[in-house]
Amino acid sequence: VDYTLAPDASIPEIVDECRRAVGWLHHQADELGIDPRRIVVSGSSAGAHLAAMVALPGWQQAAGLPADLVRAAVLVSGIYDLAPLVGTSIDIPLNLADSEVESMSPARATLDGFPRSLVCWGEVETTEFKAQSREFANGLTQAGTTCTVLEVPARNHFDVVLDLADPTTDITRRVLSVL
């Protein structure tokens, strides 16, 4: 999804854009030749955060969409709790309010009904990215979601997605198993 970037849009506006994009896919499924019951969201880094926000249950009904809109989520090297960003240079364009940290952090949300997921990260990620990924995956499992975790050996935050171009890698096989 080609969403508006901060500071031109707030995190809630960006999340709304992504949710509307997936809603559009659902509504246009026949025209696009896709099965609206097989929508999978995926993202890396900030994209994983946005994919998790789209996969969160609870917003779909108000948008006139089925509760099970998203069949699965593939989340790579994401940030799921925005609190550590507050006061950092990353927060300058985001300008996160406390209420946004709470409402826009998937790790702080009720995860009951979250679709099956693959949560992965690179072995050479920062401690914070690894911790957030592990904690979010644990939260999903505790909520009853089928969640597969994968630490990709010898990969960092920026090159972990490169393995997705190779059909023989573990991450690609795991992604395909979620589909």
Summary of predicted features, one role per range:
Residues 1-179:
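Alpha/beta-hydrolase superfamily serine-hydrolase fold, recognizing
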